[in-house]
Structures are given as structure tokens and as C-alpha cells.
Amino acid sequence: MLDLLPDLFDHYPSKLTLLPLAFRAFGGKRLFWGEVVTVKCFEDNSKVKEVLAQPGHGKVLIVDGGGSSRRALLGDLIAQSAMDNGWQGVIINGYVRDAARLSSFNLGVYALGAMPMKTEKLDQGQINVPIELGCVTVKPGMMVYVDENGIAISEESLNFAFLN
């Protein structure tokens, strides 16, 4: 079941929206899904760290970092915290660091690219607010489905029973 999205789009074409940004896979987990939690921030990952330090069983954090390539919003330490707290994955409209290490983690990590510089910690940003990614509105509580074909969101949890 590595190609989930083609089957979901075939079965639920009107219930899914594809995120149009060119995300790259960095984590070791390439297939994941879960309830959306959002963070909106710019070159400050304080809120990303705060959210991923909380229990996230069955959830995926989607971060709108404004697409900035000047600072990495996720590295190995925060990703380790996410794994330890049961998060399914992290999707970032921005950049990550520690790319080689992230590839060994059992965590879904998708971002626009990698760069080595960390952020400042100014405790700025917003948690669980609607965000815009490539003209698509992503709201907390939505569902996200990810595989190597792309990233799609839905207003509701989709049943996979038809795959059997």
C-alpha cells in the first residue's frame, strides 16, 4: 500500500484536495496519514517545538513557514521529540536541516528543501489556525494523506475498506 493517493483519488475524487507545492521527502516514513494540527510561523520554530513536544498519536503537523529558505524549521532533535510523542509526520512549507539523520527516522517529514541554519527562538507564531499552502486552505482537524505521489487533504476521515 505504498501508492495510497492514486487509489484515494480514484475512489474519493470530490473529497480530496492535492497540495500544489513541490514538497520533498526527508523522513524515513513515506506513507502516513492523520489528523491535521497547524502552526504558522516565520523563521522561528518555537511553536513547532512546542507542539511536537506534546502527544500527537495519529496526528500530522503542517507548518506554514512562508516558504522561507533562510532558516530550517525542523532538525533531528525536534524530529526525535515528534517520534517520541507518537506523531505520524511533519509537513513544512519551509526547510529542514540534519537531512541525512532525518532519513533514518520512522517519521514522515516533507519540506521544500534542506539548509543547515537553525532559527532564532523568539516564541513567535500561531498554533491551530487556518493556513494557506499554494492557494489551498488547511484547517486544524482536517485529515491529511501522504505518499510518494503527493500530499492531499480532506475535510473528513476517509475509509480505506475498498482497498481490500
Curated annotation (Swiss-Prot):
Domain of life: Bacteria
The keyword Lyase is annotated on this UniProt entry: yes
Enzyme class: lyase
Pfam families: RraA-like
Single Gene Ontology BP annotation: regulation of RNA metabolic process
GO molecular function, one term: oxaloacetate decarboxylase activity
Assembly notes: Homotrimer.
Note on cofactor: Divalent metal cation.
Entry binding sites for a divalent metal cation: 98
Protein purpose: Catalyzes the aldol cleavage of 4-hydroxy-4-methyl-2-oxoglutarate (HMG) into 2 molecules of pyruvate. Also contains a secondary oxaloacetate (OAA) decarboxylase activity due to the common pyruvate enolate transition state formed following C-C bond cleavage in the retro-aldol and decarboxylation reactions.
Protein name: Putative 4-hydroxy-4-methyl-2-oxoglutarate aldolase
The species this protein was found in: Shewanella oneidensis (strain ATCC 700550 / JCM 31522 / CIP 106686 / LMG 19005 / NCIMB 14063 / MR-1)
This enzyme's EC code(s): 4.1.3.17, 4.1.1.112
Essential cofactor(s): a divalent metal cation
Residues engaged in binding substrate: 75-78, 97
